[in-house]
């Protein structure tokens, strides 16, 4: 936006300090072969409306999430190739992984109604390579599969479960007379520590960090949780497949994000978010030994999310990325600034 450039706001500072060329729509878009739209979903329609008027013939439009195409139903000019490169984590984590010479698991797709020159897949591959995604894994998906699996993952295991479980586990520890500062650190940094094992060996390696007795206990708790939460996960999946969830979310957009902002305020004022800082170091294995319930919650949530997505017809690649592989990257955001950070960047 022109006023952002004139005011030299934080986005302008970030871009210029990292050697990106900064200018307004009218100056940059008409000459671009590839235009990548990384704005929030809520802004997509107005942004795309402006872009289409300025994009040159036979250029390419890139998305990092397909909500605007699938749920809103945006129509793009036929001469424009439309692709998607969807890293399975918040944008902040994409940048951090790239800076350390790696990348994040990524889904790529081509809009079947906008690939007139049959170049979309090659462009998507090149884009994913440029952000380091090939180091972690790039899988071809579809716009529909990416959107439905993304929404399901975020509402259940990735964000919904991590948030609810953090509050639940903290309150339970306090009830059991645990030091509030220790309880807070165990949970805040426990998710990141425990889910790191998922990167290297999935649920099996995570469970193997426990003693035999603790492993059996975690398994039994996990099975109980799955029975309790299965109907809730199924309702989430049904609402996402039918479009009901997206419809309600877009209504909230029209109401100035009232529900979203109310939820953020409530979370920010919870005892967990306001808890004191624990300054002592917690050994890595202690997070596992004292986090059996957390491990059981992760196991049940991953399995339930994956199973519900597969049953709904979502391809395994998308279901896997959105139930297990993205989880450590979401946990990283909690480790930095608890739940408020996660809520802000997702």
Swiss-Prot record:
Top-level division of the source organism's lineage: Bacteria
Family: Belongs to the ketol-acid reductoisomerase family.
Keyword field: Amino-acid biosynthesis, Branched-chain amino acid biosynthesis, Magnesium, Metal-binding, NADP, Oxidoreductase, Repeat
Name of the protein in question: Ketol-acid reductoisomerase (NADP(+))
MF GO annotations: ketol-acid reductoisomerase activity; metal ion binding; NADP binding
Known cofactor(s): Mg(2+)
Binding-site positions, NADP(+): 11, 41-43, 91
Sequence positions that bind Mg(2+) 2: 150, 322, 326
Active-site annotation: 65
GO cellular component terms attached to this protein's record: cytosol
